[in-house]
Amino acid sequence: MAAGSTTLHAVEKLQVRLATKTEPKKLEKYLQKLSALPMTADILAETGIRKTVKRLRKHQHVGDFARDLAARWKKLVLVDRNTRPGPQDPEESASRQRFGEALQDQEKAWGFPENATAPRSPSHSPEHRRTARRTPPGQQRPHPRSHSREPRAERKCPRIAPADSGRYRASPTRTAPLRMPEGPEPAAPGKQPGRGHTHAAQGGPLLCPGCQGQPQGKAVVSHSKGHKSSRQEKRPLCAQGDWHSPTLIREKSCGACLREETPRMPSWASARDRQPSDFKTDKEGGQAGSGQRVPALEEAPDSHQKRPQHSHSNKKRPSLDGRDPGNGTHGLSPEEKEQLSNDRETQEGKPPTAHLDRTSVSSLSEVEEVDMAEEFEQPTLSCEKYLTYDQLRKQKKKTGKSATTALGDKQRKANESKGTRESWDSAKKLPPVQESQSERLQAAGADSAGPKTVPSHVFSELWDLSEAWMQANYDPLSDSDSMTSQAKPEALSSPKFREEAAFPGRRVNAKMPVYSGSRPACQLQVPTLRQQCAQVLRNNPDALSDVGEVPYWVLEPVLEGWRPDQLYRRKKDNHALVRETDELRRNHCFQDFKEEKPQENKTWREQYLRLPDAPEQRLRVMTTNIRSARGNNPNGREAKMICFKSVAKTPYDTSRRQEKSAGDADPENGEIKPASKPAGSSHTPSSQSSSGGGRDSSSSILRWLPEKRANPCLSSSNEHAAPAAKTRKQAAKKVAPLMAKAIRDYKRRFSRR
């Protein structure tokens, strides 16, 4: 019993957590805990945990797990229903009730006294009832149903006693007492729970306890005798027999008064409004009787009557003792805890009721149809609960990742209203500590829903504190190297923002668009304060004006990132750095001037200052050498013109004379004959007598050509021909045959004109 109550308490706690939590990991954890618990059909019917789990069927992460768990519990409920005694047909139950009433009327008509009724079975004797009241209900064994194996026709037909039976001999049917359907029938809401149960389920006789003299404090009458009791009240008391005791008359009249005083409620009244009134009526009925306290055996059917109401509808299940499902049994008095334990023992010890729903279920198909009808049942919450439900739903939607439309919200509310009524009501009744914890967890979930990025204004606040003293001590920095928060925050993914991130420890969550894949562009390690300061001074060399007596090894990480011109500008303020930075200039020399060789007796600083002017010096030397080389070279061929002072002749006369001079040349000897003298010329060459007639033709041509010819080109060719003739004369060489042939062809060509 303790294990069952522990399981029930654990299921209720997990149910509340499933209704309040939204994180997938926690939901999966709670579902795993529920699957590990030893679940029974009674716990499922009492808590409604299956419908709470079914609401998670369409969840993105735990939907499959919740669907499998709900299906497994459904099989558990179906197997439990099949193992229980099958439900009876309503028509069959009504016929059995009519048969019992007719049998009692026949016994009264025969004149059977109260103490001379047929012998009862041991289970229906008063001694057995007193023993059963002292024995815990869990140790009692349910009585076998002897009539369930009889055919339907035999159960409907009454058995007639034999004719030779005596006056006080019971009929064969009375030897095996008729049992009414176990469990409560769907009684009217206004009736008392005690009248809704038959005594066959409690191990009692068909007649009320008051008729048999039992000291019961409640006048319990069978629900099947509702119509017959009204007829008995209208009859005179003497017509019912003279053997009835005054106690019987008093008990019946009391029961009739209770039925008349109880107002009839409509059949659609909620269980919340009906069950507290039933509980009060039970107390009043107990006080109207012998004044004894109502035992747990008489209150147990009430709890069994509530289970089908909970499994059929999604209304909140009110407990008789006011127990909060979220708090378990905490905060109850010892008497209430004892009464609650007695109720649970009675529920587990008694055989389960047959009618779990308001409509009888006869097959597995009907069970599935009822289950499908439950899923699409219209919500019937009160106005106050609808207001509370909407507020909780709005809070949950604020923490969600995406907002849905109003139409989607209405559909989701209509589908989830039946499963969330109990969970939200139980969550509303949590203690204040748990409410504060749930609010903190919801706030944490809302924070975790978004991307976990550090806002940029946090870093801007850090640099706002340092802006004043930085401006007081350092020179104004450039816009690209500024570290103040005046710049507008840009997107983290922009490359400009990454370049302008002056603070080295600033985390950049942007991703580089690289072909090899997206990688986070952030530093692997957080830099130290010294590294951050060195980075700032390296990016802002103008801010470091005077270092004073700071050792070089402190400034070395800063100076390594400076350019040579920046080092040169810092020389005027820090003369001590000139000797120390010689090694840095050496590195710059090797980087910028790879082919230069250092000169002796010169520092690397002087070397670097000289090397930028070396290319210009080499260019000037090269230009001077080229110019001197061109001046010393001899001149090449020169074209000179000979100008003759002569009168221009007509082109016709010039062409004629050229032809004549060409014809006078001797092709064999290569000599040119002198031209004919003009008539009347008295001028005689001076050298004509000294040299041979043909031999002196060249000199005569040179003398007379300026006067006779106007073509300067021809005269120049003749001048060159004269020394050639002398050379040939001295050499006495013979003209080549091809040359002679060419000359002859040339002569013939011009002679044809």
From Swiss-Prot:
Residues 366-377 have a biased composition (Acidic residues). Residues 528-537 are annotated as: Interacting with Elongin BC complex. Keywords: Nucleus, Transcription, Transcription regulation. The keyword Transcription applies. Residues 500-659 are annotated as: Activation domain. Residues 680-700 have a biased composition (Low complexity). One of its GO terms (biological process) is transcription by RNA polymerase II. The keyword Transcription applies. SIII, also known as elongin, is a general transcription elongation factor that increases the RNA polymerase II transcription elongation past template-encoded arresting sites. Subunit A2 is transcriptionally active but its transcription activity is not enhanced by binding to the dimeric complex of the SIII regulatory subunits B and C (elongin BC complex). It is found in: Nucleus. Its main location: nucleus. Residues 5-80 form the TFIIS N-terminal domain. The gene is ELOA2. GO terms for cellular component: elongin complex; nucleoplasm. This is Elongin-A2. Residues 80-245, 261-453, 477-497, 650-735 are annotated as: Disordered. Pfam families: Elongin_A, Med26. The BC-box, which mediates binding to the elongin BC complex, has the consensus sequence [APST]-L-x(3)-C-x(3)-[AILV]. Residues 147-157, 271-285, 333-348, 409-428, 654-663 have a biased composition (Basic and acidic residues). Residues 306-317 have a biased composition (Basic residues). Specifically expressed in testis. Residues 528-537 are annotated as: BC-box. Heterotrimer of an A (ELOA, ELOA2 or ELOA3P), ELOB and ELOC subunit.
